């Protein structure tokens, strides 16, 4: 969802490149698509008669080679591309696969929109909805009754979902909510136009249905958070923080192969999923071992809990409907990323199938992570401390009113974390009254409906190989008895999840529930299977009724854990075609096969997220809120793998009152230099 008529990064197309250059250099099969390859893919589709003036590219991305092929790392392997093409003139959605090596289309399928759903929302459609409504007599009459003109109103183009409204089957729809904009730099979210919503047929460029319950007072608060009248004087008590690595970072990046402190992986990027981490390995004591074959956030959904007719349909799949990778930001040194930064600039296709480079779209850096381990021992006369650090691979995306950061962290001790950072502006509404049960009052007369941000991580596990299993670990309290006379005993219960039907599970904080993923064919020096443990946050799952439309379409969010047998085609938690899909498929359909997952090649799907009851402090712009999960080695190593981490350099762990500062002067290319609190550096 967005008010922008263009994505956060300008639509600057890369120049065409002769097709002969596409295969000039050997590539790893998991390299990101290049601008040359996107040009070539478009040429192949055009020569096949699949691209005309009315054709739009809803998605274009790399088809990753099969898992067995990837293990061989065959350089120069055939590159396959998937394209989702929408032709408005023919009312036709195509799912096409092509080979860059042969220059041929290898498969095509026409979608049935009623059964299969629609292709993702186009960037072009963000602006179309305002054009359609500005020419609609009913919409204009509704604005006139509110003392407004179309020129004063911005319309949020919002995915439609699937509901019981009549005359919608098979149509490509968006729903539009209006916001008054008082001047070009005004933030319209402060002025929601309530009591009015338009259901727009973007294919036929007409209003399908309009709900207008008459004028509602438009909130008059100021939402311009950079306005000195709102923010006040900039504070002067924040002294600079300098992040310096005079010898450079400890990681290396060659192509998309990233190595750091025993870790190595390949960094991928997809217009739909954003960051994709491939082939995560860890090396320790001369042994390189696989941990995860592929890790991504396969879907995220933002369902709203307001039952009013203007908002009861608000459920946004930001990955499957809006493509979080396509909407990624270009990051700025010292603002989005701080320290010695290495950037990657992924390339995506625009609506016309031309490549668009997202300059500095991926940020890679390492950062201090506090104490790694520490102990003062009077018996041994020792006092040892080591500092931790982590490798950070991240990107930020803007999807309408919200901005999301996707952060993958790798630690020295083998820990893997994912963190989502939610910020931006909460979706607003005119508050019916102060006691309204489904929204918070965040400013006088301004409400923010309750909602959730729910994510699905797809983790294609490969702990020491493909033979993996999952066990559920619960704390068990024991009653007093002959074996527990003081009542202090507790133990841990291990439950094997042997089949897919047994592996649909929920977190339980009262039991300290975690899930242990192990390889029964690979034993550590204690004779136990090597493994990793998934630690969930245990926040609420999908809050909507079980028989609601969104519960069917976002079934992945109804449980914290799903485990499936690996299948190449099972990539997305909410399905391939999420936009206006009726639901009832995907993860529940996967587990309905009830495949054996004990000692098999398996995929762990972890649902997590935030339930947001907005606060006044979330207005006019929301401080970052976070959610995520942790994977910790559990029997994967024979002992603490960080014993070989050296202590900090001499003079850095002193006990005096000295303060050390880096020498003054300029900063090297790729360094952010001092953080000055952002004054004049990260704003406009």
Swiss-Prot record:
Binding residues annotated for Mn(2+), in chain numbering: 460, 601
Keyword Magnesium: no
Disulfide bonds listed in the record: 337-363
GO biological process, one term: amine metabolic process
Localisation: Cytoplasm
Region (Disordered): 647-684
Ligand binding (Ca(2+) 2): 500, 590
Cofactor(s) required, per the database record: Cu cation; Zn(2+); Ca(2+); L-topaquinone
Post-translational modification: Topaquinone (TPQ) is generated by copper-dependent autoxidation of a specific tyrosyl residue.
Binding site for Ca(2+) 1: 460, 601
Induction trigger: By histamine.
Assembly and binders: Homodimer.
Summary of the function given for this chain in its UniProt record: Oxidizes histamine. Other amines including phenethylamine, tyramine, tryptamine, putrescine, and benzylamine also serve as substrate.
Official protein name in the record: Histamine oxidase
Organism: Arthrobacter globiformis
């Amino acid at each position: 969802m967005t008010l922008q008529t263009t994505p956060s990064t300008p639509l600057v197309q890369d120049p065409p490149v002769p097709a002969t250059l596409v295969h000039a250099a050997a590539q790893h099969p998991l390299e990101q698509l290049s601008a040359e390859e996107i040009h070539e893919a478009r040429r192949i589709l055009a020569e096949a008669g699949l691209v005309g003036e009315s054709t739009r590219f809803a998605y274009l991305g790399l088809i990753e080679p099969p898992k067995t092929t990837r293990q061989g790392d065959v350089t120069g392997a055939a590159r396959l591309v998937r394209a989702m093409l929408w032709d408005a003139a023919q009312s036709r959605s195509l799912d096409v696969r092509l080979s860059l090596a042969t220059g041929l289309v290898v498969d095509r399928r026409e979608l049935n929109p009623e059964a299969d759903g629609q292709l993702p929302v186009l960037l072009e459609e963000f602006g179309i909805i305002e054009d359609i409504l500005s020419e609609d007599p009913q919409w204009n009459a509704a604005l006139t009754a509110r003392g407004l003109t179309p020129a004063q109103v911005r319309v949020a183009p919002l995915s439609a979902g699937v509901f019981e409204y009549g005359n919608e089957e098979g149509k490509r729809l968006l729903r539009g909510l209006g916001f008054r904009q008082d001047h070009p730099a005004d933030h319209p979210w402060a002025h929601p136009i309530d009591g009015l919503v338009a259901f727009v047929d973007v294919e036929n460029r007409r209003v399908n249905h309009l709900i207008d319950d008459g004028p509602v007072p438009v909130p008059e608060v100021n939402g311009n958070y950079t306005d000195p009248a709102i923010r006040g004087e900039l504070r002067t008590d924040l002294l600079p923080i300098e992040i310096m690595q005079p010898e450079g970072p400890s990681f290396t990046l060659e192509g998309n192969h990233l190595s750091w402190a025993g870790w190595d992986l390949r960094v991928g990027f997809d217009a739909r999923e954003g960051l994709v981490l491939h082939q995560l390995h860890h090396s320790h004591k001369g042994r390189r071992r696989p941990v995860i074959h592929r890790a991504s956030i396969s879907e995220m959904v933002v369902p709203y809990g307001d039952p009013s007719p203007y908002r009861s349909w608000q459920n946004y799949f930001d990955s499957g409907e809006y493509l979080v990778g396509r909407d990624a930001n270009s990051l700025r040194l010292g603002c989005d990323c701080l320290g010695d930064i290495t950037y990657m600039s992924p390339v995506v296709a625009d609506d016309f199938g031309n490549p668009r480079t997202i300059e500095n779209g991926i940020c890679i850096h390492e950062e201090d992570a506090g104490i790694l381990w520490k102990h003062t021992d009077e018996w041994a006369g020792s006092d040892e401390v080591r500092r931790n650090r982590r490798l950070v691979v991240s990107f930020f995306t803007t999807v309408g009113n919200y901005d999301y950061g996707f952060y993958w962290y790798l630690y020295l001790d083998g820990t893997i974390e994912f963190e989502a950072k939610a910020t931006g502006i909460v979706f607003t509404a005119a508050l019916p009254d102060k006691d309204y049960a489904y929204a918070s009052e965040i400013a006088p007369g301004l409400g923010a409906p309750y909602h959730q941000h729910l994510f699905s991580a797809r983790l294609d596990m490969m702990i020491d190989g493909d033979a993996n299993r999952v066990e559920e670990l619960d704390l068990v309290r024991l009653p007093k008895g002959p074996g527990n006379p003081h009542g202090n005993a507790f133990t841990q219960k291990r439950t094997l999840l042997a089949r897919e039907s047994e592996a649909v599970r929920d977190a339980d904080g009262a039991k300290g529930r975690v899930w242990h993923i192990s390889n029964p064919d690979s034993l550590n020096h204690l004779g136990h299977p090597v493994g990793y443990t998934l630690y969930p946050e245990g926040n609420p799952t999908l809050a909507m009724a079980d028989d609601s439309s969104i519960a069917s379409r976002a079934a992945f969010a109804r449980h914290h854990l799903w485990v499936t047998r690996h299948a190449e085609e099972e990539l997305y938690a909410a399905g391939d075609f999420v936009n206006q899909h009726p639901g009832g498929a995907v993860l529940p359909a996967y587990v309905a096969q009830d495949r054996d997952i004990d000692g098999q090649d398996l995929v762990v799907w972890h649902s997590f997220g935030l339930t947001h009851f907005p606060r006044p402090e979330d207005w006019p712009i929301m401080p970052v809120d976070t959610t995520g999960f942790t994977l910790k080695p559990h029997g994967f190593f024979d002992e603490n793998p960080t014993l070989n981490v050296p202590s900090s350099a001499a003079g850095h762990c002193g006990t005096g009152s000295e303060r050390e500062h880096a020498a003054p002067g300029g900063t090297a290319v790729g360094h952010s230099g001092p953080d000055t609190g952002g004054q004049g550096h990260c704003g406009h």
